Amino acid sequence: MTIQTSRTLSHSLGSRASSSAVAYQTECVESHRDDNGVHYGKFALGPLERGQGITVGNALRRVLLSNLEGTAVTAVRIAGVTHEFSTVPGVREDVMEILLNMKELVLRSSSPETQVGRLVAQGPGEVTAEKLQLPSDVEVINPRHHIATLAEGAILEMEFMIGRGHGYRAVDYSDSKAMAIDFLQIDSVFMPVRKVNYAVEAARVGQFLEKDRLVLEIWTNGSLTPQEALSQAARILVGLFAPLQEVSFDAPVPPKPDEDNQKNQIPIEELQLSVRAYNCLKRAQINTVADLLLYTEEDLLEIKNFGQKSAEEVVQALKARFGLTLPRTREKGKA
Protein backbone atom coordinates (compact mmCIF):
# COMPACT_ATOMS: atom_id res chain seq x y z
CA MET A 1 0.00 0.00 0.00
CA THR A 2 1.39 3.40 -1.00
CA ILE A 3 0.18 6.75 0.25
CA GLN A 4 1.44 9.90 -1.47
CA THR A 5 1.44 12.87 0.88
CA SER A 6 2.54 16.45 0.67
CA ARG A 7 2.59 18.20 4.01
CA THR A 8 4.49 21.43 4.46
CA LEU A 9 5.70 23.06 7.65
CA SER A 10 7.47 26.40 7.90
CA HIS A 11 10.46 26.97 10.15
CA SER A 12 12.76 29.88 10.82
CA LEU A 13 16.53 29.64 10.98
CA GLY A 14 18.19 32.09 13.35
CA SER A 15 18.44 32.80 17.07
CA ARG A 16 16.09 35.79 16.90
CA ALA A 17 13.14 36.63 14.71
CA SER A 18 13.76 39.36 12.18
CA SER A 19 12.97 40.27 8.63
CA SER A 20 16.40 38.91 7.60
CA ALA A 21 15.77 35.43 9.06
CA VAL A 22 15.75 32.65 6.46
CA ALA A 23 12.51 30.64 6.38
CA TYR A 24 12.60 27.02 5.27
CA GLN A 25 9.95 24.36 4.84
CA THR A 26 9.75 20.66 5.70
CA GLU A 27 7.63 18.65 3.29
CA CYS A 28 6.64 14.96 3.47
CA VAL A 29 6.91 14.02 -0.19
CA GLU A 30 6.04 10.32 0.07
CA SER A 31 4.99 7.81 2.73
CA HIS A 32 4.02 4.14 2.44
CA ARG A 33 4.13 0.85 4.32
CA ASP A 34 4.83 -2.54 2.72
CA ASP A 35 3.44 -5.97 3.57
CA ASN A 36 6.43 -6.72 5.84
CA GLY A 37 5.63 -3.75 8.06
CA VAL A 38 8.52 -1.58 6.86
CA HIS A 39 7.43 2.05 6.87
CA TYR A 40 9.03 4.45 4.37
CA GLY A 41 9.00 8.23 4.39
CA LYS A 42 10.62 10.80 2.13
CA PHE A 43 11.07 14.39 3.29
CA ALA A 44 12.37 17.57 1.71
CA LEU A 45 13.83 20.43 3.77
CA GLY A 46 14.67 23.76 2.23
CA PRO A 47 15.77 26.22 1.23
CA LEU A 48 18.81 26.02 3.52
CA GLU A 49 21.97 28.09 3.41
CA ARG A 50 24.69 26.69 1.19
CA GLY A 51 26.54 23.99 3.17
CA GLN A 52 23.81 23.49 5.77
CA GLY A 53 22.27 20.60 3.84
CA ILE A 54 25.20 18.28 4.54
CA THR A 55 25.48 19.49 8.15
CA VAL A 56 21.81 18.90 8.95
CA GLY A 57 21.52 15.71 6.90
CA ASN A 58 24.55 14.02 8.46
CA ALA A 59 23.51 14.96 12.01
CA LEU A 60 19.95 13.69 11.52
CA ARG A 61 21.14 10.45 9.92
CA ARG A 62 23.47 9.62 12.81
CA VAL A 63 20.84 10.33 15.45
CA LEU A 64 18.14 8.41 13.57
CA LEU A 65 20.30 5.29 13.32
CA SER A 66 21.85 5.24 16.79
CA ASN A 67 19.99 7.37 19.34
CA LEU A 68 16.30 6.56 19.02
CA GLU A 69 14.90 4.24 21.68
CA GLY A 70 13.21 0.99 20.72
CA THR A 71 11.80 -2.24 22.16
CA ALA A 72 13.14 -5.77 21.67
CA VAL A 73 13.21 -9.27 23.16
CA THR A 74 16.37 -9.63 25.29
CA ALA A 75 16.14 -13.19 26.68
CA VAL A 76 14.01 -16.34 26.25
CA ARG A 77 13.27 -19.29 28.52
CA ILE A 78 11.82 -22.42 26.86
CA ALA A 79 10.37 -25.24 28.96
CA GLY A 80 12.68 -28.25 29.00
CA VAL A 81 15.58 -26.40 27.33
CA THR A 82 18.88 -25.67 29.08
CA HIS A 83 21.04 -24.38 26.20
CA GLU A 84 20.60 -22.94 22.72
CA PHE A 85 21.99 -25.99 20.90
CA SER A 86 19.18 -28.32 21.94
CA THR A 87 15.82 -29.14 20.32
CA VAL A 88 12.20 -29.25 21.44
CA PRO A 89 10.31 -32.52 20.75
CA GLY A 90 7.82 -32.12 17.91
CA VAL A 91 9.09 -28.68 16.86
CA ARG A 92 10.59 -28.39 13.38
CA GLU A 93 12.94 -25.53 14.28
CA ASP A 94 15.80 -26.06 16.72
CA VAL A 95 16.23 -23.71 19.67
CA MET A 96 18.72 -21.50 17.83
CA GLU A 97 16.21 -20.87 15.03
CA ILE A 98 13.47 -20.08 17.55
CA LEU A 99 15.75 -17.55 19.26
CA LEU A 100 16.54 -15.90 15.93
CA ASN A 101 12.83 -15.67 15.13
CA MET A 102 12.18 -14.06 18.52
CA LYS A 103 14.99 -11.61 17.85
CA GLU A 104 13.19 -10.43 14.69
CA LEU A 105 9.95 -9.58 16.51
CA VAL A 106 8.97 -5.93 16.13
CA LEU A 107 7.46 -4.60 19.35
CA ARG A 108 6.28 -1.25 20.64
CA SER A 109 6.13 -0.45 24.35
CA SER A 110 5.40 2.65 26.41
CA SER A 111 7.00 1.27 29.58
CA PRO A 112 10.69 1.81 30.43
CA GLU A 113 10.69 -1.27 32.67
CA THR A 114 11.72 -4.79 31.67
CA GLN A 115 8.58 -6.88 31.17
CA VAL A 116 7.78 -10.55 30.58
CA GLY A 117 5.75 -12.07 27.75
CA ARG A 118 4.57 -15.69 27.40
CA LEU A 119 3.67 -18.24 24.77
CA VAL A 120 1.87 -21.56 25.15
CA ALA A 121 1.11 -23.31 21.84
CA GLN A 122 0.04 -26.84 20.92
CA GLY A 123 0.42 -28.55 17.55
CA PRO A 124 -0.20 -29.20 14.86
CA GLY A 125 0.28 -25.88 13.11
CA GLU A 126 2.34 -22.76 12.69
CA VAL A 127 3.03 -20.49 15.65
CA THR A 128 3.08 -16.80 14.76
CA ALA A 129 3.58 -13.63 16.79
CA GLU A 130 -0.16 -13.03 17.12
CA LYS A 131 -0.32 -15.95 19.60
CA LEU A 132 2.05 -14.24 22.05
CA GLN A 133 0.67 -13.22 25.44
CA LEU A 134 1.99 -9.68 25.96
CA PRO A 135 1.65 -7.09 28.75
CA SER A 136 -1.09 -4.53 28.21
CA ASP A 137 1.30 -1.74 27.18
CA VAL A 138 3.28 -3.87 24.67
CA GLU A 139 2.12 -4.24 21.07
CA VAL A 140 3.43 -6.57 18.38
CA ILE A 141 3.83 -4.79 15.04
CA ASN A 142 4.35 -7.88 12.85
CA PRO A 143 1.70 -10.34 14.15
CA ARG A 144 2.17 -12.71 11.19
CA HIS A 145 5.86 -13.16 11.94
CA HIS A 146 6.81 -16.87 12.04
CA ILE A 147 8.15 -18.29 15.31
CA ALA A 148 7.93 -22.11 15.02
CA THR A 149 6.13 -25.04 13.38
CA LEU A 150 4.62 -27.71 15.67
CA ALA A 151 3.79 -31.32 14.86
CA GLU A 152 0.75 -33.22 16.18
CA GLY A 153 0.81 -33.29 20.00
CA ALA A 154 3.85 -31.01 20.31
CA ILE A 155 3.79 -28.27 22.95
CA LEU A 156 5.91 -25.12 22.92
CA GLU A 157 5.95 -23.17 26.16
CA MET A 158 8.19 -20.17 26.72
CA GLU A 159 8.68 -16.90 28.57
CA PHE A 160 10.65 -13.97 27.21
CA MET A 161 11.96 -10.67 28.54
CA ILE A 162 11.05 -7.43 26.79
CA GLY A 163 13.30 -4.41 27.27
CA ARG A 164 13.93 -0.94 25.90
CA GLY A 165 17.23 0.46 24.75
CA HIS A 166 19.26 2.12 22.02
CA GLY A 167 21.12 0.65 19.07
CA TYR A 168 22.43 -2.91 19.21
CA ARG A 169 23.12 -4.81 22.44
CA ALA A 170 25.20 -7.98 22.34
CA VAL A 171 24.68 -10.84 24.78
CA ASP A 172 26.00 -9.98 28.24
CA TYR A 173 27.04 -13.21 29.96
CA SER A 174 27.84 -11.27 33.13
CA ASP A 175 24.12 -10.60 33.68
CA SER A 176 23.75 -12.97 36.62
CA LYS A 177 20.04 -12.20 37.03
CA ALA A 178 19.10 -13.58 33.62
CA MET A 179 21.56 -16.48 33.76
CA ALA A 180 20.41 -17.59 37.20
CA ILE A 181 16.81 -18.20 36.11
CA ASP A 182 17.64 -20.22 32.98
CA PHE A 183 16.93 -17.52 30.40
CA LEU A 184 18.81 -17.79 27.13
CA GLN A 185 20.03 -14.32 26.23
CA ILE A 186 19.95 -13.09 22.65
CA ASP A 187 21.50 -10.14 20.84
CA SER A 188 18.93 -7.35 20.85
CA VAL A 189 18.28 -4.88 18.04
CA PHE A 190 16.48 -1.87 19.53
CA MET A 191 16.87 0.40 16.49
CA PRO A 192 13.42 1.36 15.15
CA VAL A 193 15.06 3.01 12.12
CA ARG A 194 16.49 0.47 9.68
CA LYS A 195 17.95 2.73 7.00
CA VAL A 196 18.48 6.43 6.26
CA ASN A 197 19.57 8.11 3.03
CA TYR A 198 20.02 11.79 2.37
CA ALA A 199 20.95 13.91 -0.63
CA VAL A 200 21.62 17.61 -1.02
CA GLU A 201 20.29 19.38 -4.09
CA ALA A 202 20.64 22.94 -5.31
CA ALA A 203 17.55 25.00 -4.51
CA ARG A 204 16.44 27.96 -6.58
CA VAL A 205 15.69 31.24 -4.82
CA GLY A 206 14.58 33.81 -7.34
CA GLN A 207 16.75 33.42 -10.42
CA PHE A 208 19.75 31.90 -8.67
CA LEU A 209 20.66 28.39 -7.44
CA GLU A 210 22.21 29.66 -4.23
CA LYS A 211 20.55 27.50 -1.56
CA ASP A 212 20.52 23.83 -0.44
CA ARG A 213 17.56 21.47 -0.48
CA LEU A 214 17.90 18.42 1.77
CA VAL A 215 16.07 15.25 0.71
CA LEU A 216 15.85 12.70 3.52
CA GLU A 217 14.62 9.09 3.17
CA ILE A 218 13.78 7.07 6.30
CA TRP A 219 12.86 3.39 6.63
CA THR A 220 11.52 2.18 10.01
CA ASN A 221 10.50 -1.25 11.28
CA GLY A 222 6.94 -0.05 11.86
CA SER A 223 7.19 0.60 15.60
CA LEU A 224 7.64 4.27 14.69
CA THR A 225 6.48 6.15 11.64
CA PRO A 226 9.20 8.02 9.72
CA GLN A 227 7.52 11.27 10.79
CA GLU A 228 7.76 10.28 14.46
CA ALA A 229 11.38 9.20 14.02
CA LEU A 230 12.34 12.51 12.38
CA SER A 231 10.58 14.48 15.11
CA GLN A 232 12.35 12.54 17.88
CA ALA A 233 15.74 12.96 16.19
CA ALA A 234 15.20 16.71 15.92
CA ARG A 235 14.29 16.94 19.63
CA ILE A 236 17.44 15.01 20.57
CA LEU A 237 19.62 17.39 18.55
CA VAL A 238 17.90 20.45 20.04
CA GLY A 239 18.48 19.08 23.54
CA LEU A 240 22.11 18.37 22.69
CA PHE A 241 22.87 21.89 21.49
CA ALA A 242 20.62 23.88 23.85
CA PRO A 243 23.23 24.08 26.68
CA LEU A 244 25.62 25.82 24.27
CA GLN A 245 23.34 28.87 24.35
CA GLU A 246 24.40 29.48 27.95
CA VAL A 247 28.16 29.08 27.51
CA SER A 248 30.13 31.17 30.01
CA PHE A 249 33.01 33.14 28.55
CA ASP A 250 34.61 33.89 31.93
CA ALA A 251 38.14 32.55 32.04
CA PRO A 252 38.51 29.85 34.69
CA VAL A 253 40.46 30.93 37.75
CA PRO A 254 43.52 28.71 38.11
CA PRO A 255 43.86 27.17 41.56
CA LYS A 256 46.39 28.86 43.80
CA PRO A 257 49.41 26.68 44.43
CA ASP A 258 49.63 25.39 47.93
CA GLU A 259 52.87 27.09 48.85
CA ASP A 260 52.93 25.65 52.35
CA ASN A 261 52.48 22.14 50.99
CA GLN A 262 55.31 22.69 48.50
CA LYS A 263 57.58 23.83 51.30
CA ASN A 264 56.62 20.85 53.40
CA GLN A 265 57.88 18.43 50.75
CA ILE A 266 61.37 19.99 50.66
CA PRO A 267 64.11 17.60 51.87
CA ILE A 268 66.07 18.69 54.92
CA GLU A 269 69.21 18.81 52.78
CA GLU A 270 67.95 22.24 51.62
CA LEU A 271 68.46 23.57 55.17
CA GLN A 272 72.24 23.19 54.73
CA LEU A 273 72.76 22.02 58.31
CA SER A 274 75.98 20.91 59.90
CA VAL A 275 76.93 17.27 59.53
CA ARG A 276 76.13 16.55 63.19
CA ALA A 277 72.64 18.09 63.11
CA TYR A 278 71.85 16.53 59.72
CA ASN A 279 72.86 13.00 60.80
CA CYS A 280 70.85 13.24 64.02
CA LEU A 281 67.71 14.24 62.11
CA LYS A 282 68.18 11.44 59.57
CA ARG A 283 68.58 8.84 62.33
CA ALA A 284 65.28 10.10 63.80
CA GLN A 285 63.58 9.49 60.39
CA ILE A 286 63.16 13.22 59.80
CA ASN A 287 63.62 13.48 56.03
CA THR A 288 61.57 16.51 54.94
CA VAL A 289 60.54 19.90 56.26
CA ALA A 290 57.06 18.42 56.78
CA ASP A 291 58.55 15.82 59.14
CA LEU A 292 60.49 18.51 60.96
CA LEU A 293 57.44 20.72 61.53
CA LEU A 294 55.87 17.94 63.60
CA TYR A 295 58.50 18.61 66.29
CA THR A 296 58.93 21.36 68.89
CA GLU A 297 62.29 22.67 70.09
CA GLU A 298 61.90 20.53 73.20
CA ASP A 299 61.21 17.46 71.03
CA LEU A 300 64.44 18.04 69.11
CA LEU A 301 66.45 18.11 72.33
CA GLU A 302 65.15 14.62 73.13
CA ILE A 303 66.79 13.20 69.99
CA LYS A 304 69.95 11.28 70.82
CA ASN A 305 73.13 13.40 70.51
CA PHE A 306 71.04 16.43 69.48
CA GLY A 307 72.07 19.35 71.71
CA GLN A 308 70.92 22.93 72.24
CA LYS A 309 73.34 24.26 69.64
CA SER A 310 71.98 21.92 66.96
CA ALA A 311 68.39 22.83 67.88
CA GLU A 312 69.15 26.55 67.51
CA GLU A 313 70.82 25.85 64.16
CA VAL A 314 67.68 24.10 62.86
CA VAL A 315 65.36 26.87 64.09
CA GLN A 316 67.51 29.57 62.48
CA ALA A 317 67.75 27.66 59.17
CA LEU A 318 63.97 27.21 58.97
CA LYS A 319 63.42 30.91 59.69
CA ALA A 320 66.07 32.16 57.28
CA ARG A 321 65.32 29.94 54.29
CA PHE A 322 61.57 29.37 54.45
CA GLY A 323 60.13 31.76 57.03
CA LEU A 324 58.98 28.85 59.21
CA THR A 325 59.18 28.54 62.96
CA LEU A 326 59.01 25.71 65.47
CA PRO A 327 57.10 26.10 68.73
CA ARG A 328 59.27 25.91 71.83
CA THR A 329 57.01 23.51 73.69
CA ARG A 330 54.04 21.34 72.82
CA GLU A 331 50.67 22.71 73.93
CA LYS A 332 49.02 20.92 76.81
CA GLY A 333 46.51 18.31 75.77
CA LYS A 334 48.26 17.60 72.46
CA ALA A 335 50.27 14.44 71.96
Swiss-Prot record:
Keyword match rRNA-binding: no
Name this polypeptide is given: DNA-directed RNA polymerase subunit alpha
> What is one process in the GO biological process aspect for this record?
DNA-templated transcription
Query: What's its job?
Result: DNA-dependent RNA polymerase catalyzes the transcription of DNA into RNA using the four ribonucleoside triphosphates as substrates.
Domain description from the entry?
A: The N-terminal domain is essential for RNAP assembly and basal transcription, whereas the C-terminal domain is involved in interaction with transcriptional regulators and with upstream promoter elements.
- Can you cite an annotated GO cellular component? cytoplasm
Transmembrane feature ranges: none
Q: Which residues form a coiled coil?
A: none
- Please state the Enzyme Commission number of this protein: 2.7.7.6
**Organismal lineage:** Bacteria, Bacillati, Cyanobacteriota, Cyanophyceae, Synechococcales
Q: Where is this region: Alpha C-terminal domain (alpha-CTD)?
A: 256-335
Family membership? Belongs to the RNA polymerase alpha chain family.
What keyword terms does UniProt attach to this protein? DNA-directed RNA polymerase, Nucleotidyltransferase, Transcription, Transferase
Q: Does the keyword Transferase apply?
A: yes
GO MF term set: DNA binding; DNA-directed RNA polymerase activity; protein dimerization activity
- Known catalysed reaction(s)? RNA(n) + a ribonucleoside 5'-triphosphate = RNA(n+1) + diphosphate
Q: How does it assemble?
A: In cyanobacteria the RNAP catalytic core is composed of 2 alpha, 1 beta, 1 beta', 1 gamma and 1 omega subunit. When a sigma factor is associated with the core the holoenzyme is formed, which can initiate transcription.
Q: Supply the InterPro entries for this chain.
A: DNA-dir_RNA_pol_insert, DNA-dir_RNA_pol_RpoA/D/Rpb3, DNA-dir_RpoA, RBP11-like, RNAP_asu_C, RNApol_insert_sf
Q: Where is this region: Alpha N-terminal domain (alpha-NTD)?
A: 1-248
